[in-house]
Amino acid sequence: MRIRETFPQPEKANIIMDTTYFGRGFGVMVLMDSISGQALSVREVKHETNALYAEALNALREKGVVIQSMVCDGRKGLLQLFPEIPAQLCQFHQVKTVSRYLTRNPKTAAGKALWQLALTLKDGSKVAFQNALQAWFEQHQGFLNERTVNEESGRSHYTHKQLRSAYLSLKRNLDYLFTFEAHPGLGIHNTTNLLDGKFADLKRSGVSSRDEKGE
């Protein structure tokens, strides 16, 4: 199956962008317009990079497409590529990030509480979530800041590194998790789920056979 790189361009677009892989060194990077539900840019890549995303976005802008917003998975530096464009971090991917640090079954009370809080992302507002995250921090600050001393070197490190990473990820990304709420008139999606569904369709349609056959 051949992959077209460009499609008919709308005047305005809310971009959802991500890359899926069909094998080692064969990925498909897609920029989709959530307003029309159409892909605007599709290209084969070996690895996704911020430079490739920037190139694809700039190509659309050069064709006159007004990028009203963009939604992505939170790849480091990607949200900051175009500060003039409202950028939404996929809430589903944020929850996945927290689960990588805490697992889906944390052992500590603080971890369990933070995991349950992360699961409320899709249901609440920025103010409510921010207040709840601050309340969690105030309740568990002592535990979060516990340090373990290495008896041989005398140096110390945070005891609960994974918990700290999960908390700091939520705190650091807070401004990007509710962009859709700050721009209600644009109809920005809060996840990349619409594009994820298209990726599933691509895989069912046999794009992966291209990689298997070496085409």
Locations of the language-model features?
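Intrinsically disordered, low-complexity regions enriched in Ser/Pro/Gly/Gln/His and often acidic
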Residues: 19, 108, 128-130
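Short loop/turn segments at secondary-structure transitions that flank enzyme active sites
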Residues: 23, 88, 96-98, 104-105, ...
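A short hydrophobic/aromatic micro-motif that marks alpha-helical segments and, especially, helix-coil
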Residues: 33, 48, 108, 210-211
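Acidic/histidine-rich catalytic cores and adjacent linkers
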Residues: 65-76, 82, 116-215
